[in-house]
């Protein structure tokens, strides 16, 4: 009797899939950009020591935070590459133990802005960090988004 119930689906439920198994197929790696033939994009970068700017800091167009750096780059730029560019212009980012947290700032459908953290790097890593190789194109970056960099 119990055997018949199992055959008809009345037995014990199946165990869940093992942890750590990715249920979604991996996204294809974006094609590298030919930097000789492709025009760079203007990335507006806002830096702040101690934390990220708030979404209210970006609320009024034309009155964005003052600590802006404009960088011409490509969508295949990695967070490590952007870290090195920020270090060129920010004294705080050059500290030996400085940690840089990256966030995208993008408009929402309510007329304001969202701030979403996307990765973290070290100014002078003693080993490769997990987010170092993430590129703008692998992250949900769209041309026109701002990059907010918190320096700790």
Swiss-Prot record:
One biological process term in Gene Ontology: response to salt stress
Bias (Basic and acidic residues): 28-38
Record keyword Transcription present: yes
Keyword Transmembrane in annotation: no
Signal peptide location: none
GO molecular-function term, one example from the UniProt record: transcription corepressor activity
Gene knockout outcome: Plants are hypersensitive to salt.
Keywords (A to Z) from UniProt: Repressor, Stress response, Transcription, Transcription regulation
Function comment: Links the histone deacetylase complex to transcriptional repressors bound to chromatin. Involved in the tethering of the SIN3 complex to core histone proteins.
Name listed for the protein in its UniProt record: Histone deacetylase complex subunit SAP18
């Amino acid at each position: 009797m119990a055997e018949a119930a199992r055959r008809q689906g009345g037995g014990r439920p199946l165990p869940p899939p093992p942890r750590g198994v990715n249920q979604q197929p991996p996204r294809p790696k974006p094609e590298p950009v030919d930097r000789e033939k492709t025009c760079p994009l203007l990335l507006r970068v806002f830096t702040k020591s101690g934390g990220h700017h708030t979404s209210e800091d970006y609320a009024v167009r034309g009155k964005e935070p003052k600590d802006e750096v404009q960088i011409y780059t490509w969508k295949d730029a990695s967070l490590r590459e952007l870290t090195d560019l920020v270090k060129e212009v920010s004294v705080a980012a050059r500290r030996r133990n400085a940690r840089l947290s990256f966030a995208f700032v993008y408009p929402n459908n309510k007329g304001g802005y969202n701030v979403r953290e996307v990765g973290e790097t070290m100014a002078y890593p003693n080993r490769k960090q997990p987010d170092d190789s993430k590129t703008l194109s692998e992250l949900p970056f769209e041309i026109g988004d701002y990059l907010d960099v918190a320096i700790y």
